[in-house]
Design a protein with these regions (language model features):
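Non-catalytic terminal and connector segments of soluble metabolic enzymes
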Residues: 1-119
Length: 119
């Protein structure tokens, strides 16, 4: 869990620099601490985005995180990376290399067939 700073948010939202909504978004992101997680798995970005639902909580279906707990497009309850490339960039912004660990999960064989497992 961390408290967001302007420095972190400027780096994370660099593609939105100068857009009218950015100051309000940054203020919202700094209100409370946030929980950061790195997930892994087959097609993890696609799967997590499906679990989150559409960005606008009002239009997200029940059973998704945004559909069950979100009501706003700007005061968003959750963020998920668009794809693996975005995830790698975001992980680099928010995590130090010594905070991440490579390991082989003992239960991997129960989730994926051998030919489906990512290396």
């Amino acid at each position: 869990m961390i408290k967001m700073t302007d420095l972190l948010l400027d780096e994370h939202y660099a593609q939105h620099k100068g857009k009218h909504f950015l100051p309000r978004l940054k203020d919202f992101m700094k209100l409370l601490p946030v929980v950061l997680v790195v997930l892994e798995g087959l097609e993890v970005a696609r799967v997590v985005r499906a679990m989150c639902g559409p960005t606008d909580g009002k239009n997200a279906p029940p059973g998704t995180i945004r559909g069950d707990f979100g009501m706003s497009i700007s005061n968003n309850i959750i963020h998920s990376s668009e794809d693996l490339e975005s995830a790698k960039k975001e992980i680099g912004i928010f995590f130090k290399t010594d905070e991440l660990f490579n390991y082989e999960r003992a239960d991997l064989q129960f989730y994926y067939a051998e030919d489906e497992r990512e290396n």
